């Protein structure tokens, strides 16, 4: 009967259950349930035609319950799946026992607000935060000054000058992280902090304390402020240096959050700086857009579940293809572009990835022993 019910329900007509009373040989009344289909089949023509029955079916309490043919099929599949061996060596069939909800839960929603208008605003694509890097994004950057600082520090400390590939690797890292983990000049925390401080002093002497905004940066941050989009500034420079630089060019009022090297333990490509800035802005990572100029920034932003806009200031555009958007100047972007990046149909609705458990079984040895004759 289940197959017949499923076949008829596919036509689009819902069957109904009707209870009737019958008498058996002992003249005792017995109530039975039958299934009645509101279709009439005509076999007189060449093809089989179905017509809706005009007569109304008497409604009762049982007629309001639909026939769940699909549920019966799923029950059969569930029983078959239960018979499979449940061991770690068995590959999962792909069937998920947990019921899934649609639409998925929006991570931007915050029921504790108790304000439907604020909740609706948070779930819209206009609720987003901007996280800017400092050098090469907002101001002009000269990477040769950093390289010269490392070479000068190596000469003062009596170390061998780091090669070019190692200097490229330490870009975006904290000075302490680069000295102890990449350059391997010292593991003593006191010596590491001393050399990191000395490196910044050399950089400031070479730089001269003159900062110049990149073309289009001032206009873009003005647009974001007019649209009430909160902004954060992150850098691996010391806070004192960063505060003085931001104040000297008059853009301190645009940033509600500033994250410096003292606030985090590791620099790029670790996403710690960006995640901490998102927490201070009170935004979920999926609604934050990072503006950087290197592949280390793109990697860190994606590891933190954020979108990234790359500015081609020191790298060509084709090397920054991993970012969601690549521009030469910030004023090439519009609010519509940012809203599309913050759209809730992106990674916000995707399930978080879980690490697969490795198979720790010992494989049999493939060696073959041969007796010597």
Swiss-Prot record:
Optimum pH is 6-8. One of its GO terms (molecular function) is 5-amino-6-(5-phosphoribitylamino)uracil phosphatase activity. It catalyses: 5-amino-6-(5-phospho-D-ribitylamino)uracil + H2O = 5-amino-6-(D-ribitylamino)uracil + phosphate. The keyword Chloroplast applies. Optimum temperature is 40-50 degrees Celsius. GO terms for cellular component: chloroplast. Its cofactor is Mg(2+). It is found in: Plastid, Chloroplast. This is 5-amino-6-(5-phospho-D-ribitylamino)uracil phosphatase, chloroplastic.
